[in-house]
Amino acid sequence: MTDSQTTATETRSPRRRRRLLGGTAASVGLITAMLTAGSLPAQAACEESGQWLFSPETESAESLVSAGPPQSNYNGTGSTASTTFSAQASATVEASVSGSANVSLDAKLASMSATYGTSFSPSLTAGPGNDITIDIPPGQTGNGEYGVYTVTVTGTETLYGPSCEAVESRTSTVTSPVRVGWNTWLS
């Protein structure tokens, strides 16, 4: 403290010092009472508190579940030829879960769709009557396979506490159908 501050403090009357200290104590008491009574806004409640949520982390490439055997046609001519393949059988593929199952399948599929921008379905069917025509160069074989494409997504299920802290985490894998279609290739 400087000399002027010391002098100013020493020249205050004992009565003024009691009043300043009393005012400070009253302010602290008022703030404490307000906090205890809940007069100040409380921290917002965590929406995820007590819930398990699924966070997708890795997505596989599409894989085809075939509806019947592959079809083939050899072009033994000297020019390009067209061939038409027709689906003869049907296949229904349903989504499956391995690992942790604290989050519903519907909630996992919704989270996956939002993350990857793909429509993940609980079930899709590839049926007969679907045709595709391809061009086959001379001396090559055209091949076609019809069915349901699936994608496998691995992610983490997390249980959240009252302050939105992760309380527990578990791995979960979902394989889901994403579309029906043909795979064609030349050999």
Give the predicted meaning of each segment.
Residues 27-37, 50-56, 60, 64, ...:
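Hydrophobic alpha-helical membrane segments, chiefly transmembrane helices and signal peptide h-regions
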Residues 1-44:
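Secretory targeting and sorting signals
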Residues 42-86, 175-187:
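Extracytoplasmic low-complexity, Pro/Thr/Ser/Ala/Gly-rich segments
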Residues 33-43, 54-55, 151-159, 172-174:
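Secretory-pathway extracellular proteins and peptide precursors enriched for disulfide-bonded cysteines
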